[in-house]
Amino acid sequence: MMFCYQCEQTTRSPAGIGCTSEPGTCGKDEATAGLQDILTHLMKGIAQYARRARAMGVADRRTDDFIFYGLFTTLTNVNFTATRFVHLIQEASKRRERIKLLYEEAAREQGKTPEILSGPALFQPADSLEQLLRQAPSVAINADVEHLGSDVIGARALILYGMKGVAAYAQHARVLGYQSDEVDAQAEEILDYLASNPTDLDEMLEESLEVGRLNLKVMELLDVANTDSFGAQEITSVRISPIQGKAILVSGHDLHDLKQILEQTKDQGINVYTHGEMLPANAYPLLKAYPHLAGNLGGAWQDQQREFADFPGPIVMTSNCIIEPGRSYKNRIFTLGPVGWPGVRHIDNGDFTPVIQAAKALPGFTADAKEQRITIGFGHHTLLGVADKIVDAVKHGDIRHFFLVGGCDGVSPARNYFTEVADNAPADSVVMTLGCGKYRFNKHEFGDIGGIPRLLDIGQCNDAHSAIRVAGALAEAFNCGVNDLPLSIMLSWFEQKATAIHLSLLALGIKGIKLGPTLPAYLTPTLVQKLQSRFDLDLDLIGEAQADLQTALAHTA
């Protein structure tokens, strides 16, 4: 029987929590869920040897490349193709043996006896799909829950799911050529810790903060990678309605993939549009320099079945979030990198000729739509450049409060909370936003305060790094801590990248975070109590938008 409870929309019923029958709420079948568990288990085994090899002076970058890529494939709404996971499992087994040999050779060369490891280091995956599925329950996240209890399993899950989010951001940086030995070493250490099957709750919560600290380093690395590769985000008016012509829609998060598509479609008479979390690409100078980057269409991931069906061209998924393609567009959607869906064409060689051919064969937009625009590009480079103006506005009473409202979106009606907060924030407040949660209000009119826009789109979910930088700069300007600022954080979560970001905020000691719309299923009442007492968390948001606004506004500089 499958078991998965890593996303916000996991099944919750009187019978229990977690998706235990196929398909899960994300569309994942039992085979894929089981294979993902095996692959994750093997990643821990690889890390066991990689950490020890590194201690012997042997750091193997290809091994760490595979760890991050492999974990990324197991995120919610990334890869649903069981056959791909069979291949990845086979590859993981080979890579584990390779790093094991490197470790043992290095130990012997230094006159030391190699450790005899256990757990994931020794797990031998079966050769066939049928046999692999028989093995899967033994390595599932909830294996031995009857003996260990749900608190221990939940604390382990918090660490693991945070690491999956870290892996996604690290992979985006690595495809741009940015890697850090410090990051790789810490990732190996955390996965090795999980491989030891820890049971101490307080120790595991401390380790989860290590995941948060690691994610801070990775988000900073990705910010440098994006800025060095494409320039710093600029304030940009981006079109959100189509223009006449052939068209390609690019969704996901990977700016490197978008750059390749833009380069290969130059002078082809094809317009390229972004979708979802790819919206901030339109603010990067070296990407918006392509004249056929025509703007952004659509909204958050959960609306893609309707939006993709209406789009008159091919769609390219560069990362999560993919959901089951509708019949009307399944033959014109493509996946890249870690993404996969059964029966959908996958491009793994960087050649987008099939996408270009599809764009030319499909009708495209037959006329310009009425022009509509929104303003984006308020990353930390932009905001820190006008920090003095913002500080003066606060000192003169023009800006009373800051709200950070964003994160992952989803289908729950309870997520209207975030719309209510943003729309009802008073006229002397500024709303910063990021991630796909912004689509709930980023087309609304917010106006400005003395030329400072009241709605500041900071970027993708990983641009939480920018929000942290800005908050730190404001705290320094006012000679106070971040928790003393007139700043309220309302974080919407859906999948594992949001888990990593949340852990990063906790690692920074930021208190009073509003998290929702529901509690992560793996956080048991015991774990919630420990987190609430230490971090002053408020984990129940439903129906409290107006009350939370009043409470927030009582906290002023």
From Swiss-Prot:
InterPro entries: HCP/CODH (IPR004137), Hydroxylam_reduct (IPR010048), Prismane-like_a/b-sand (IPR016099), Prismane-like_sf (IPR011254), Prismane_a-bundle (IPR016100)
Listed Pfam families: Prismane
GO MF annotations in UniProt: 4 iron, 4 sulfur cluster binding; hydroxylamine reductase activity; metal ion binding; peroxidase activity
Modified residues (Cysteine persulfide): C408
Chief location: cytoplasm
Known catalytic reactions: A + NH4(+) + H2O = hydroxylamine + AH2 + H(+)
Keywords assigned by UniProt, alphabetized: 4Fe-4S, Cytoplasm, Iron, Iron-sulfur, Metal-binding, Oxidoreductase
Task performed by this protein: Catalyzes the reduction of hydroxylamine to form NH(3) and H(2)O.
Classification via HAMAP family: Hydroxylam_reduct
UniProt family annotation: Belongs to the HCP family.
PANTHER family recorded: HYDROXYLAMINE REDUCTASE
Protein name (Swiss-Prot/TrEMBL): Hydroxylamine reductase
Organism: Acidithiobacillus ferrooxidans (strain ATCC 53993 / BNL-5-31)
Organism lineage string: Bacteria, Pseudomonadati, Pseudomonadota, Acidithiobacillia, Acidithiobacillales
